[in-house]
């Protein structure tokens, strides 16, 4: 569980009052630990023969479907998953775990280093979605208004500090 000033770490049955604090994952297990645990689990059962990329992907999609069912038909006005009853929270934890396990297994089978791939993808996303064009917008990067305003104009609109910078640069 969390320590003072550590932020919330998620577990089933956590009280709703903790939802106001920032959420943080536990430092362990790492993705490599999860890959190893699943590989050992599959090897003990001689299941590697069934873990071709296609099969892992279909299993992943099935688990995403089970996760989606937990949210299906819930009203947008209902409290979020943080306030669900313990039985529903436990189901949420299990389905999210299944999704992660299959995602890690698929990445391992395809030799994709997920942590490095995430770093690379975030760099790509930063280029596709510059803050000054995408802040507060749900538009896809191909629909963003490229070249219509400068970064200083967008970020600094109404900001006294940016107005001082603009004046100093003229």
From Swiss-Prot:
Cofactor binding annotation: Probably binds two or three Mg(2+) ions per subunit.
Share an example GO biological-process annotation for this protein: nucleoside triphosphate catabolic process
Q: What is its EC number?
A: 3.6.1.12
Q: Tissue-wise, where is it found?
A: Ubiquitous. Highly expressed in heart, liver, skeletal muscle, cerebellum, brain, and salivary gland.
How does the record characterize pH dependence? Answer: Optimum pH is 9-9.5.
Q: Which positions does the record annotate as the modified residue N-acetylserine? A: 2
Mutating residue 47 to I leads to what result? Reduces affinity for substrate and catalytic activity by about 50%
Which amino acid positions bind substrate, per UniProt? 38, 47-51, 73, 102
Residues annotated as binding Mg(2+): 63, 66, 95, 98
The family database entries (InterPro entries) matched by this protein are listed as: dCTP_Pyrophosphatase (IPR052555), DCTPP (IPR025984)
Q: How does activity depend on temperature?
A: Optimum temperature is 60 degrees Celsius.
The keyword Phosphoprotein appears for this protein: yes
Q: Report the residues modified as Phosphoserine.
A: 2
Q: How is its activity regulated?
A: Inhibited by divalent calcium or cadmium ions.
Effect the entry attributes to changing residue 66 to Q: Loss of activity
Q: Which cofactor does it need?
A: Mg(2+)
Query: Where is the region Disordered?
Result: 1-25, 150-170
Picking any one GO molecular function of the record gives:
dCTP diphosphatase activity
Catalysed reactions, as listed in the record: dCTP + H2O = dCMP + diphosphate + H(+)
Q: Name one GO cellular component term.
A: cytosol
Give a short account of what the protein does: Hydrolyzes deoxynucleoside triphosphates (dNTPs) to the corresponding nucleoside monophosphates. Has a strong preference for dCTP and its analogs including 5-iodo-dCTP and 5-methyl-dCTP for which it may even have a higher efficiency. May protect DNA or RNA against the incorporation of these genotoxic nucleotide analogs through their catabolism.
- Database matches in PANTHER family: DCTP PYROPHOSPHATASE 1
Subunit field text: Homotetramer.
What is the name of this protein? dCTP pyrophosphatase 1
Organism from which the protein derives: Mus musculus
Q: What is the lineage of its organism?
A: Eukaryota, Metazoa, Chordata, Craniata, Vertebrata
